UniProtKB/Swiss-Prot annotation:
Entry-linked CDD domains: ALDH_F18-19_ProA-GPR
Keywords: Amino-acid biosynthesis, Cytoplasm, NADP, Oxidoreductase, Proline biosynthesis
Transmembrane segments: none
Origin organism lineage: Bacteria, Bacillati, Actinomycetota, Actinomycetes, Micrococcales
Pfam families according to UniProt: Aldedh
EC number: 1.2.1.41
Organism of derivation: Leifsonia xyli subsp. xyli (strain CTCB07)
Role according to the record: Catalyzes the NADPH-dependent reduction of L-glutamate 5-phosphate into L-glutamate 5-semialdehyde and phosphate. The product spontaneously undergoes cyclization to form 1-pyrroline-5-carboxylate.
Location (main, coarse): cytoplasm
Gene behind this protein: proA
Recorded GO CC terms: cytoplasm
Record-given protein name: Gamma-glutamyl phosphate reductase
Any one Gene Ontology BP term: L-proline biosynthetic process
Amino acid sequence: MSPTSTATSLTDRFSAAKRASIALAIASNAEKDAALRGIAEGVLAAADSILAANAVDLATGRENGLSTGLLDRLTLTPARLQGLADAVLEIVALTDPVGQTVRGSALPNGVKITQIRVPFGVVGAIYEARPNVTIDIAALALKSGNAAVLRGGSAAIATNGVLVGVIQEALAAAGLPADAVQTIDDFGREGANGLMQARGFVDVLIPRGSAGLIQIVVTQSAVPVIETGAGVVHIVLDESAREDWAVDIVRNAKAQRPSACNAVETVLVLRAAAERLLSPVLGALTEAGVTIHADEIALPHSPGAIAVTAEDYATEHMSLDVSVRVVDDLDAAIEHIRTHSTQHTEAIVTNDLANAERFLNEVDSAVVMVNASTRFTDGGEFGFGAEVGISTQKLHARGPMGLPELTSTKWIVRGAGQVRS
């Protein structure tokens, strides 16, 4: 199963996506949901083909030296395919944002003004070794009335090709244009560069991947970008933190899925808490298979730890590695976060209300937490379904981006002959 688009050039594909976006913008919720159900069913029906293609990508990735974290993100299993299908069906159950009223009023002269949600048009996405993103973005774009042009990278080219074929067949079966979702992976780097310069065809571009990839897209794209930042995520442990909470939260945030962007990368322990918390927390991490990159104070508390480097503090490991630093006080912890954070997610474990409120007020990230695992930064966990990414910028959207964040707005003005005096 392969993509069904017959467009032979990048411009042809962008033009086809633009035309398809016009049809999607006025498609009914029933039509869009029918396509989504078809995608969910198609993913499961084509499981053998998808997994075979994924095996090819994984073998190539190992030959090319992909990191453990990227290989994990690249890997699909029957359970993960079922999870993808289930996630698409969850999107079916969500409220269609298109046409929703944001606000409205009636002027004294009787003119009625309403602001409503409308699709962006064509959403572009550039991402690395994440075939799940192919389904997530396509499904979210479809539900919100957008076409999608996907550049999933060479590492997942075989897998993404089969997945987009499944999506296009579901679109056609639902009476919607198959060109509404396209991959340009076959164009290689030319495709990525073309997508970044496709202003006039593509309305918004969303990069997902490493800090390097995101920075390239942000600096080189002529298309407006919604930045989904890398996750150099921090957890602070203060002197009042409960030991069991500190152990459970840090272990979950690092070891549950270390390749996730919301996994913790640096643990900051206040000096007053170091003697009490370092050994149990680092011991739990070691038992979970985590390599500790410790500063000179933390090193003696973790046999087998290695010395942390300055580069570690700015690294999204995407693996079972974590940096640990002992800092003088909450001031120093917040300053460290300001210096090294990618403004994704930060958390503090504390029983001190003043410290909690200060942390919430002074840390400027998309998601700031008290006494909870950073793994909760996720659209599904937040209760609004799948997300297209975690936005770390301040314009348009910030944090997990669900369906409403894939829309813009327009103003509807209804009059009865009024003119401006």
